[in-house]
Design a protein with these regions (language model features):
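Short S/T/G/P-rich N-terminal loop/turn motif that feeds into the first structured element of a domain
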Residues: 17-84, 91-101, 123-126
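Short, exposed beta-strand-loop hairpins at the edges of beta-sheets
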Residues: 97-100, 107-113
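Short alpha-helical segments used as structural interaction elements across diverse proteins
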Residues: 3-4, 34, 49, 113
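Bacterial N-terminal signal peptides that target proteins for export
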Residues: 2-12
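C-terminal partner/receptor-binding element of secreted or periplasmic proteins
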Residues: 114-122, 126
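Conserved catalytic core of Hanks-type protein kinase domains
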Residues: 89-90, 115
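Hydrophobic alpha-helical segments, especially transmembrane helices
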Residues: 7-8, 53, 98, 106
Length: 126
């Protein structure tokens, strides 16, 4: 192989490596059709830490019983004006609608509703 051919092949290889690096380094994001169900809550006066934890743990239990919930987020890093934030990711809007009044939701409400002072719910999707 002559030196010009080697240089051309080396140049092509370097160009390919550079192109792969550019593709890997691109900021990619998606717009999934899942639904984030976000609940902010202020607990009733006198609610114990054990009661709060039972309500939060109840979300994990509910997610294990209802197939429409993909993920949960239960550990807020910053909370303003409320005591807790809980997030459930539903597979899609139909899964969120089907969740209402399920046995899993009713079971969780038995723990959550008695200690809930105020709450706001936000549902977000694409």
């Amino acid at each position: 192989m002559n030196s010009i051919t080697r240089r051309v092949l080396l140049g092509c290889a370097l160009l390919a490596i550079f192109a792969v690096g550019v593709v890997i380094g691109q900021n990619k994001f998606g717009q999934p059709k899942s639904v984030l169900h976000i609940v902010t809550v202020k607990w009733k006066e006198g609610t114990t830490d054990a009661q709060k934890q039972k309500a939060i743990d109840g979300i994990k239990t509910m997610a294990s019983k209802y197939d429409g919930i993909k993920n949960v987020w239960l550990k807020p890093l910053k909370v303003q004006g409320t005591d807790a934030v809980m997030v459930m990711e539903f597979k899609d809007e139909a899964a969120l609608k089907a969740y209402v009044d399920t046995p899993a939701q009713k079971e969780w409400y038995e723990v959550y509703i008695p200690i809930r002072g105020q709450s706001q719910t936000h549902d977000i999707t694409n």
